[in-house]
């Protein structure tokens, strides 16, 4: 479609129908060899990650883990089928979206299987535990995926081409994961049960665990988070004071040009500064040039102010004349005007604000308690600030994938929060005036702890493999995601419930309030139980 539009525009211009002069505001030239290597390494990472994920699920969950393995294979096949049928452009971030989606697809399975274990541990038969586990896990799975879909939708609306690709594959993956988690796995589980696999030992059961007093560390958790965020702010202030940018903004945010050479040998940072950068300055007639070496490779990127086509050609000719590039590679250039970078900044801010507001509204509607919504949003703000602090510490480039990274973390983090809040809400429905709210919250956190740990591990497996095997741009995207997943798990366990508790959840009135809501609407499951 875009090619046809471009051809039509070119035709109009040639015949003089449109009296205008074209001005380059953004351009990108990428070597085919780099693209091929990046896609190949990402696909291999996906295959290895999927194999490790399946092994982990089988070891931890036995028969349900085997079911999860089959559902993951079906999930991956369906996602790739939909990408092919609808001719979706598969960018590097798009592939990352598929890989991340595989990790997140396991989330639903873990929620269901930990529920089944709880039901078996409570004395129910395997058949009854399967039915009850699926029914009780449905709302959590739907809520978690809807919040991620909100983030994907916002990314698609405000993102550029590569980010749109990531948002598309992430959204497709979320929709497919709901289907595979709630339909496919249930069918396979029932078939295995009907074929005679009925012994509880094949499904596992939760052993009694002492309730952890998580609320007792809420003050220290808050202090620790505040220290990390403050350190990030101080780091940004110091960088600004030294004349650098507070964060390592890439071209998308500040505008300018990046020229990347893959030399035939590796040069040290000092050699580049003393020998190559002066050649670039003289060729283009500029003063400010920044270098960025790619670890364990001969690739070097040079950031400058906006360059004209003539300046870019002059740099390429001057540098390659003295410092030959590797055979089979080309000089890659990327230019973004200040007008485009201003738009990117605006869209980045709007996307985070809009996604946060949408999630707040959704959580409020689902839980009918503004305290749950406020606690969740404050936790999301915490996660975003901690990851931004990490960007400041590590000086990772902040570009368009930064938006995708932040909204993915927001969408993922809210999943863990919803699971705990859902358990608190469930226990509040059966609570009375004598119920100790502190114990209720601690019990809810403890009972969902295994789910938080397992889902974090499954997602981290995919991300770590992708980080190890991916190209530089993929590493810069996955590393903050890894940090975000860990931070999200921490905030879900240590902060969100504590904030709800402090904001009034600890009061006796919250029990009476929720009992009234429960009386007006009871959830009845297929096995006849009520919650």
Residue ranges of each PLM-predicted region?
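A structural signal for conserved, well-ordered secondary-structure elements
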Residues: 1-531
């Amino acid at each position: 479609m875009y090619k046809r539009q471009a051809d039509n525009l070119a035709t109009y211009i040639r015949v003089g129908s449109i009296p205008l002069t074209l001005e380059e505001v953004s351009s990108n030239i990428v070597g085919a060899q780099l693209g091929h290597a990046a896609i190949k390494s990402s696909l291999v990472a996906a295959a290895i990650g999927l194999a490790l994920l399946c092994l982990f699920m089988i070891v931890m969950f036995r028969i349900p883990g085997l079911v999860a393995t089959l559902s993951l294979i079906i999930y991956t096949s369906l996602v790739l089928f939909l990408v092919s049928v609808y001719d979706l452009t598969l960018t590097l971030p798009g592939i990352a979206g598929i890989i991340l989606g595989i990790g997140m697809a396991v989330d639903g399975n873990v929620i269901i299987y930990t529920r089944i274990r709880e039901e078996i541990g409570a004395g129910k038969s395997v058949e009854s535990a399967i039915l009850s586990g699926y029914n009780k896990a449905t709302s959590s799975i739907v809520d978690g995926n809807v919040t991620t879909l909100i983030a994907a939708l916002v990314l698609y609306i405000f993102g550029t081409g590569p980010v749109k690709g990531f948002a598309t594959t992430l959204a497709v993956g979320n929709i497919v994961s709901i289907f595979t988690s709630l339909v496919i796995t249930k069918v396979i589980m029932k078939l295995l049960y009907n074929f005679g696999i009925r012994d509880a030992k094949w499904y596992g059961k939760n052993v009694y665990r002492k309730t952890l007093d998580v609320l007792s560390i809420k003050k220290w958790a808050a202090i620790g988070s505040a220290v990390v965020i403050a350190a990030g702010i101080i780091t940004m202030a110091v960088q600004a004071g030294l004349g650098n940018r507070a964060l390592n903004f890439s071209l998308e945010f500040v505008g300018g040009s990046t020229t990347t050479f893959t030399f035939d040998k590796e040069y040290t940072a000092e050699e580049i500064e003393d020998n190559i950068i002066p050649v670039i300055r003289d060729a283009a007639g500029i003063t400010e040039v920044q270098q960025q070496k790619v670890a364990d490779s001969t690739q070097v990127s040079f950031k400058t102010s906006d360059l004209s086509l003539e300046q870019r050609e002059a740099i390429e000719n001057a540098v390659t004349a003295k410092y030959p590039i590797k055979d089979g590679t080309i000089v890659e250039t990327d230019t973004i005007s200040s007008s485009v970078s201003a738009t990117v900044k605006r869209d980045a801010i709007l996307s985070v604000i809009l996604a946060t507001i949408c999630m707040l509204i959704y959580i409020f509607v689902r839980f009918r308690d503004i305290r749950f919504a406020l606690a969740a949003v404050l936790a999301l703000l915490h996660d975003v600030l901690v990851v931004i602090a990490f960007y400041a510490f590590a000086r990772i480039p902040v570009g368009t994938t930064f938006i995708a990274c932040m909204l993915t973390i927001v969408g993922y983090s809210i999943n863990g929060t919803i699971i705990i809040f859902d358990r608190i809400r469930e226990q509040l429905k059966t609570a009375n005036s004598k119920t100790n709210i502190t114990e209720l919250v601690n019990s809810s956190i403890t009972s969902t702890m295994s789910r938080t740990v397992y889902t974090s591990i499954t997602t981290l497996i995919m991300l770590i493999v992708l980080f190890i095997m991916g190209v530089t741009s993929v590493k810069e995207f996955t590393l903050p995601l890894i940090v975000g997943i860990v931070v999200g798990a921490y905030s879900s366990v240590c902060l969100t419930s504590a904030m709800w508790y402090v904001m009034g959840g600890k009061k006796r009135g919250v029990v009476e309030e929720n009992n009234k809501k429960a009386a007006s609407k009871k959830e009845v499951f297929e096995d006849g139980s009520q919650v």
